Structure formats: structure tokens, C-alpha cells
Regions:
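Family-specific signature for flavin-dependent thymidylate synthase
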Residues: 1-167
């Protein structure tokens, strides 16, 4: 339970905000205030339908007509255009002298962000226990699966027992 881990994670902002809520895990995000790398956005491979049985969440079923990120005639093209418009506005603001810490407010939630995430085996196991469930957003579940894979490599007996709630 006292094993310590640090992970370098890259995910969309909306996933980072979902995961930052976990107790006893320290997240140090790389800020656009100090980083001038090109921005990168997340676009899903499939636009999922809203789940019929919960207020939030999605089903495993794709929305007809929106299956491909390359279907620029439909919603994916609109998302791509919106992201580009936001980047153009961000760059214009920075090039006009606006501080990057303020200009970044125009960037969308699909912006990819990176962070160092540190905590104990117990804290990460608790996060995995909650975020590996079927009702967790798919993109968040992917991060939890990556963390769980690493936990099992280091603690092949304890990690599954902690995640399953046996320990």
C-alpha cells in the first residue's frame, strides 16, 4: 500500500479535470503559461451516443454519420474548424502582447495537456477502482487502464486485490 509511483500522463483537458479530483494523488500539470509548444487536440475515433439510463455518460454505440474523425462534412469537421479558430485566436492574442496565461482561456477542453502524477499504490488503486468501471467516461477509463497496467507490473498480487477492494 505504501509503494510510490510517478506517471507522465498526456490526455485531453477534460480528462485531466476529471482525474484531478482523486485524494492523495499529486498532479503537477505543465502549463501553457510556460510552454510554447504547438497545441494538440483530442478527437475521438467515434462520436458516442448519450447513455439512455444515466444523466451523464455515453453508450458504446456510435452516432450514425459521425463515426470517423475524417468525416469533415459533419460534426468532426465542425470540431476541427472550431479548434483551429481557437488556436488562431490564441496565437493572435499572444502575438499582440496578451500574456499566455490569459490567452489560454480561449483554448477548448479538447486541448491535450500533460502532467506528472504521483502517489502511493493505495491511492492509485483507489483511483483505478473508481475509474475502471463501465460507467466511467471512455477517455478517462483509458488513462486508468494505463495506470493499472503499470501497478500490476510492480505489484502483481497486491494491485489487483486493492483495485477489487479485497485489501
Amino acid at each position: 500500500n505504501h509503494g510510490f509511483f510517478s506517471f507522465e500522463v498526456k490526455a485531453p483537458v477534460f480528462v485531466a479535470r476529471h482525474l484531478v479530483k482523486h485524494e492523495y494523488l499529486i498532479m503537477s500539470e505543465y502549463s501553457r503559461r510556460y510552454i510554447t509548444d504547438d497545441v494538440e487536440f483530442y478527437t475521438p475515433d467515434v462520436w458516442r451516443k448519450a447513455a439512455a439510463d444515466v444523466k451523464q455518460g455515453s453508450s458504446d454505440e456510435g452516432v450514425e454519420g459521425y463515426e470517423s474523425i475524417f468525416d469533415f462534412e459533419d460534426i468532426s469537421g465542425d470540431v476541427y474548424s472550431n479548434n483551429q479558430d481557437c488556436v488562431d485566436l490564441y496565437n493572435h492574442m499572444v502575438n499582440s502582447g496578451v500574456a499566455p496565461e490569459q490567452a489560454r482561456m480561449v483554448l477548448p477542453q479538447s486541448l491535450m495537456t500533460s502532467w506528472t502524477w504521483s502517489g502511493t499504490l493505495g491511492a492509485f488503486a483507489n483511483m483505478c477502482k473508481l475509474r475502471l468501471s463501465k460507467d466511467t467516461q471512455y477517455e478517462t477509463r483509458l488513462v486508468a487502464q494505463g495506470v493499472y497496467t503499470e501497478l500490476k507490473k510492480q505489484f502483481p498480487i497486491a494491485a489487483p486485490l486493492l483495485v477489487e477492494g479485497v485489501l
